[in-house]
Amino acid sequence: MCMIRVCIKSFLIVALTLLSIGSVNANAGGGVYRFLNLPFNAKLAGLGGENVSVQSDDVNQFYTNPALLSSSLNSKISLSYVNYLADANGGMASYSYALDSLNYFGFNFLFMGYGDLDGYDRYGNETEEFSAGDFAWNLVYARYLGANFTVGLAMKPVYSHIESYSSFGLGFDVGANYYRKDWDFSVGLSVRNFGFRFTDYYDEQGTERLPWNIQMGITKGLEHAPFRFSVTYDHLNDWSLDYKRPEKSNSLLSLEDTEKDQNEIKFADMLFRHLVFGVEVLIGKNFHFDMAYNHRRNREYALSQARGMNGFSFGAGLKVYKFNLDAAYAKYAPSGGTFTLSLSSSIDSFKKK
């Protein structure tokens, strides 16, 4: 009992420290480089796009929480592909290395390309096509403190270009994780993407902050059943997640459409917009199935008369020989969703013994 109290006290100290770090970065929920909030690997996409606590053999897990690095991920590498909405395509490469039993390093490179876009001048006349893309490098260090605690720090240079315009920014992540392997219990806290854009697309634009976010999550596996559940609270730094849209009287646009009082979000609805629920079905060591529900995604992408499976996501992973293959599909809107594919392996598994 004494050990449990010490662990809880230690985690609260770390949590308050991270929250204080995040609180200096105002303008919650806004900011530039919004692609940094996207799930760039299949495991994360299958768990609803938001998770900072799940412990697995997936090397990509430290992307959302640098404290999820561990010695078990030593020399693992992964490549991911994302087919996003509106013909946008992206990907991520990940690598981790354990310096020793206490110190771990990780690296992510991610990009999002938006294809060829139609160009127009200020008068609406068509010009040449142009391209746009976003890139980020995520450099991660984590240290095991003992008593089941790990803390981590990530630095991420960001580059973005639209046509002939470009910008550069620098962001940081800070995370903490408490993990009891014998309980299959994990608690994670992550302050993500706090930082600034230093060079602008054009001179008069001004400096803007990155889309910072504080997330906290709990993951617990059942002792006598192959299920592991996760609950993630998204945007601890911002209660109001009300993406407002006009209520349409019909499917046609009208100048008379206005927002109505019934669009006000009730307390319970707002609370659930912060929560992402996920479950993993662990079938042996070589296969798993994931499913999640993201209520905010369900509400924001819904049509007035149709929501369907909006907000649900599904994923599966299979180990074949020395490779792990994961795939996920996330439903965003009635007309479509996203597909993510990840392939990972351990470099050590190919070394001759």
Mark where each language-model region is.
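Bacterial N-terminal signal peptides that target proteins for export
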Residues: 1-12
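Charged, low-complexity surface segments at secondary-structure and domain boundaries
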Residues: 1, 15-17, 33
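Bacterial N-terminal signal peptides
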Residues: 10-20
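Subset of outer-membrane beta-barrel
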Residues: 25-353
